Swiss-Prot record:
The gene is RPL13AP3. Keywords: Ribonucleoprotein, Ribosomal protein. GO terms for cellular component: nucleus; ribonucleoprotein complex; ribosome. Belongs to the universal ribosomal protein uL13 family. This is Putative ribosomal protein uL13-like. GO terms for molecular function: structural constituent of ribosome. One of its GO terms (biological process) is translation. It comes from Homo sapiens (Human). Disulfide bonds: none annotated.
Length: 102
């Protein structure tokens, strides 16, 4: 809970940014996983939890379909990027082997 009626709480709420999906300025940044914050580690199996997208839809948020399509596009781009990265790593390994032979 956040004390939104105090100046400090109001200031912290002003700093808060919440996104469903990954918006354009952040989609090109490298993402990292914090193992201690994973749902599997943090939540007990018997506890109920709620997803932000589902809650927003229940209060008549109308952009869930847009977010879903953008997320699919992002996943496709990430898949292509990962494939190119694998190809580059394979070529680099081959080049290192060729250098060691000579």
């Amino acid at each position: 809970m956040l004390r939104h009626k105090t100046k400090r709480g109001h200031a912290s709420l002003d700093c808060l940014k919440v996104f469903d999906g990954i918006p354009p300025p952040y989609d090109k940044k490298k993402r990292m996983v914090v193992p201690a914050a994973l749902k599997v580690v943090r939540l007990k199996p018997t506890r109920k939890f709620a997803l932000l997208g589902r809650q927003a839809q229940e209060v008549r948020w109308k952009y869930q379909a847009v977010t879903a399509t953008l997320e699919e596009k992002r996943k496709e781009k990430a898949k292509i990027h990962y494939w190119k990265k694998k190809q580059l790593m394979r070529l680099r390994k081959q080049a290192e082997k060729n250098v060691k032979k000579n």
